[in-house]
């Protein structure tokens, strides 16, 4: 049986070295012993001999329950996966002639999204003759930029794409 890292640590008869540094089931260092002695000690207490540090000279082995070790490793991996946050891009849509109160509501939402660690894409949609007043849209995005400058940085500067002007901001 060949050992691959995804199988987990080598255990019992899979350990193919003549001598190992042994740590018993109570965590006490037993010194360097032969593999046969280590296997006998593990069998005595009804546990497995597991290679903990394979790169050491001689390798470090511990007498523990292999099933319990695998369970703890899986649990640790699941915990780290749970703690990782996927950064999403939230979108806030506005018009160039947005009212003061509406702007305040949108700004609050931007602050909330940034506080949650997400990126925010602010989109200004121009309709009809509003395209002639792109400078108003640029001023509005500059205002958003200034109002969020203490908590966010600009990831992509305001740019015009078709009838929309957009800008992306992210937490500092």
UniProtKB/Swiss-Prot annotation:
GO terms for biological process: ribosome disassembly. It is found in: Cytoplasm. InterPro entries: T_IF-3_C_sf, T_IF-3_N_sf, Translation_initiation_fac_3, Translation_initiation_fac_3_C, Translation_initiation_fac_3_N. IF-3 binds to the 30S ribosomal subunit and shifts the equilibrium between 70S ribosomes and their 50S and 30S subunits in favor of the free subunits, thus enhancing the availability of 30S subunits on which protein synthesis initiation begins. Belongs to the IF-3 family. Monomer. This is Translation initiation factor IF-3. It comes from Bartonella henselae (strain ATCC 49882 / DSM 28221 / CCUG 30454 / Houston 1) (Rochalimaea henselae). The gene is infC.
